A protein has these predicted regions:
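N-terminal pre-core extensions flanking Radical SAM catalytic domains
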Residues: 311-329
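Flexible, glycine/proline-enriched loop segments at strand-loop-helix junctions
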Residues: 95, 120-122, 144-151, 184-189
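Short hydrophobic alpha-helical runs that function as membrane-insertion/retention elements
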Residues: 118-123, 145-147, 232-233, 287-289
Length: 339
């Protein structure tokens, strides 16, 4: 099954909201919530994709003709490429009835592990969502990162107790999920966290801890102060706040401020291996890609994620070769035009 065939299959089964577009740029689903759309006018979601397209590559092939190495190491694990499947949930609500969260996570986590990368998994008000994700991660030898919503402290600690039993490579919290419209007013409540509260959560987790939803230098510094091992520069795919800058726009300043002090991941509108190269050149250590992995699972089942990973890795390696970078460590900001 090839990439085009998977896209075709996904269009037939991904429900009324996601169109499984050839390029997942947000134009067809824009403000569609339920569905994969953005909050408000969807300006943030659309800007994420658009700004990566405005970054241009400086080619330079006067260099050694050597093999390209895309391998990436984080928290003691080595991956085929600096790519993670991003956090998504409420699959039936947003993407169609073919998969519930438990089945989706089973397929995603195991398929990503087989493809040489790892998946972030989601959380929800139904305890079975986290339980199912943790079961999938444990079955894959810990090759996955459960993402806990910013619930009240009692609920967060209970979730972390469950996480510990699965022994994942790390644990994450999407701190910006407090802005999701469909989490408003639910029980347990979700909301923002102080540095001290995050410090308590991180101490309790006893695992490398990733704070997702960082969009400012000050936010990155607070995550570092709280003891985070990594951050994800993210605006939740444009789903939590309208009229925000893109992740491509804020990444360089954040990387300049905290790069080397913690691991920096980024998501939001990255759609091919060239985009991944741009993110690494701007200071990220790795990337998360969300919505396209949904399309791959819906259209290709267990085969889908591996097809996407292979495509992204090949595109990344090709861009590296055309810029004279033979390893991720050799990717520099001046390989981008105007930087």
């Amino acid at each position: 099954m090839d990439y085009s065939e998977i896209l075709k299959n996904a269009r037939e089964c991904s429900g009324p909201y996601c169109k499984a577009c050839p390029v997942c740029n947000g134009m067809a689903c824009r403000t569609q919530v339920p569905g994969p759309g953005g909050k408000g006018t969807a300006a943030t979601m659309l800007r994420n994709y658009q700004k990566w397209q405005e970054v241009c590559i400086n080619m330079d092939t006067i260099c050694e003709n050597a093999p390209i190495d895309t391998t990436f190491t984080m928290f003691g694990r080595t991956f085929a490429a600096p790519i993670f499947a991003g956090t998504l949930g409420a699959m039936k609500r947003h993407y169609g009835d073919k998969y519930d969260d438990l089945t989706y996570n089973d397929i995603l986590v195991s398929s990503c592990a087989q493809a040489g990368i790892a998946a972030f998994t989601g959380d929800g008000t139904n305890p079975a969502v986290m339980e199912g994700a943790l079961h999938a991660i444990a079955a894959s030898g810990g090759a996955g990162i459960p993402t806990v919503k910013p619930w009240n402290m009692e609920t967060v600690f209970a979730k972390l107790d469950a996480v510990r039993q699965a022994d994942p490579m790390a644990v994450a919290m999407d701190i910006d999920a407090a802005g999701l419209p469909f989490l408003k007013g639910l029980t347990p409540p979700a909301g923002s966290k102080t540095v001290e509260e995050l410090r308590q959560i991180i101490d309790y987790a006893k695992k490398p801890f990733i704070i997702k939803g960082i969009m400012t230098v000050r936010g990155a510094q607070k995550a570092l102060e709280a003891g985070a091992s990594a951050i994800v520069v993210s605006n939740h795919g444009g789903r939590v706040q309208d009229q925000c800058p893109s992740t491509a726009e804020v990444l360089p300043a954040i990387a300049d401020a905290v790069g080397g002090k913690l691991t920096i991941l980024v998501d939001g509108g990255l759609r091919n291996g060239t985009d991944i190269f741009k993110a690494l050149a701007l200071g990220a250590d790795g990337v998360l890609i969300g919505r396209p992995f949904v399309t791959m699972v819906y259209g290709g089942g267990a085969q889908g994620p591996g097809v996407l990973v292979k495509k992204l890795q090949a595109e990344l390696a090709d861009t590296m070769a055309m810029c004279g970078a033979h390893s991720l460590a050799e990717i520099r900001r001046d390989m981008l035009f105007g930087y």
